[in-house]
Curated annotation (Swiss-Prot):
Belongs to the QueA family. Pathway: tRNA modification; tRNA-queuosine biosynthesis. Keywords: Cytoplasm, Queuosine biosynthesis, S-adenosyl-L-methionine, Transferase. One of its GO terms (molecular function) is S-adenosylmethionine:tRNA ribosyltransferase-isomerase activity. Monomer. Transmembrane segments: none annotated. This is S-adenosylmethionine:tRNA ribosyltransferase-isomerase. The gene is queA. PANTHER family: S-ADENOSYLMETHIONINE:TRNA RIBOSYLTRANSFERASE-ISOMERASE (PTHR30307:SF0). Its EC number is 2.4.99.17. Pfam families: Queuosine_synth. It catalyses: 7-aminomethyl-7-carbaguanosine(34) in tRNA + S-adenosyl-L-methionine = epoxyqueuosine(34) in tRNA + adenine + L-methionine + 2 H(+). InterPro entries: QueA, QueA_dom1, QueA_dom2, QueA_sf.
Length: 353
């Protein structure tokens, strides 16, 4: 399909710079399986779901992956000190990360970047688009602790361009379920949930389980090809525990609905599906790319936020509910002044029949 088929005009005023307060006060557009949509709120979830429905949450935790450092003056080859912005996006091993850096052109293989007094990293690989491999002078838990001190919360670029990171983001950009550190962006659909909403869902008889996908910075990269067949999806690490697989498989076997919360939870369970209605426990890197015509082995409904024009995430929701339906639903959301993107409002999408 042509990438331009997934385009739409989004006024900048629709981009949310702060979350709703409280979190579950956000609005929610419900899109039924027949394409009919209705204006609701996140707090309406217990009324829209059924006893026995299984919600699947991503329990990844965002790390403070935005770092500012200095490349010292070179003793050989010239060049004074250079300020460097580093956004970690994928862990390679205990001491190495891949990162997007600026200005990448001012860095060479073997250059050292200093982040404060003690944390340092050496450039050991360079790729296109400012993507470099960094090896730090710490490893494992010690490196995690050093990054936590030196780094800032990595807000999406469309928010960071409009305002700086502040202390509110440290709490606002983590979900209620955040447990396993490793993401450089939040699984944003999970940001809408509060203890009160979870209690109401439990009282309704809605069940829950958790999976993990560590969100990479590639989630913000634009699609540069003209045709979806030519796009190479970024890969991210994900895992489904035996407990989660058992819960999902039991729900499917009993005819109960499985509802991932967020595209990351959906991509995880679909990546580890071994057949219709069956997901296997395990871990893997996934580059699954879902577009109209793709099959869904597990997902019956999806709760997600509103996404960028021509993004892989808008392609995913179009695959689930239909491109024509999503174009109409998004046009309605824009006209009705829904709030878009990471800190914005939500959609509850039923798989198209």
């Amino acid at each position: 399909m042509r990438v331009s088929d997934f385009d739409f005009h989004l006024p900048e005023a629709r981009i949310a710079l702060r979350p709703a307060r409280p979190r579950d006060a956000a609005r929610m557009l419900h899109v039924a399986s027949n394409g009919v949509f209705a204006d609701r709120g996140v707090r309406d979830l217990p009324d829209l779901l059924q006893p026995g429905d299984l919600m699947v949450f991503n329990d990844t935790r965002v790390i403070p992956a935005a770092l500012k450092g200095i490349r010292p003056a070179r003793a050989v080859g010239g060049g004074g000190p250079v300020e460097v912005e580093v956004n970690l996006h994928k862990r390679i091993d205990a001491s190495a990360w891949r990162a997007f850096v600026r200005p990448a052109k001012r860095l060479r293989m073997g250059d050292e970047i200093a982040f404060g007094e003690t944390l340092k990293a050496e450039v050991t690989g360079k790729s296109e688009g400012g993507d470099v491999r960094l090896v730090f002078n710490a490893a494992g838990a010690a490196l995690d602790a050093a990054i936590a001190v030196a780094g800032e919360m990595p807000l999406p670029p469309y928010i960071a361009r409009k305002r700086g990171v502040d202390e509110k983001d440290e709490a606002d950009y983590q979900t209620l379920f955040a447990t396993h550190e490793g993401s450089v962006a939040a699984p944003t659909a999970g940001l809408h949930f509060t203890p009160e909403l979870m209690a109401a869902l439990e009282a309704r008889g809605v069940e829950q389980t958790r999976v993990t996908l560590h969100v990479g910075a590639g989630t913000f990269l634009p699609v540069k090809s003209d045709d979806t067949d030519d796009h190479q999806m970024h890969s991210e690490w994900c895992t489904v525990s035996a407990e989660a697989a058992d819960a999902i498989n039991a729900a499917k076997a009993e005819g109960r609905r499985v509802i991932p919360v967020g595209t990351t939870a959906l991509r995880t369970i679909e990546s580890l599906a071994s057949g219709p209605g069956i997901v296997r426990a395990g871990s893997r890197d996934t580059d699954i790319f879902l577009t109209p015509g793709s099959d869904f082995a597990i997902t019956d409904m999806l709760m997600t936020n509103f996404h960028l024009p021509k993004s892989t995430l808008f392609m995913l929701v179009s695959a689930l509910s239909g491109l024509d339906v999503m174009q109409r639903a998004y046009a309605h959301a824009i006209a009705a002044e829904y709030r878009f993107y990471s800190y914005g409002d939500a959609c509850l999408l039923e798989r198209r029949t």
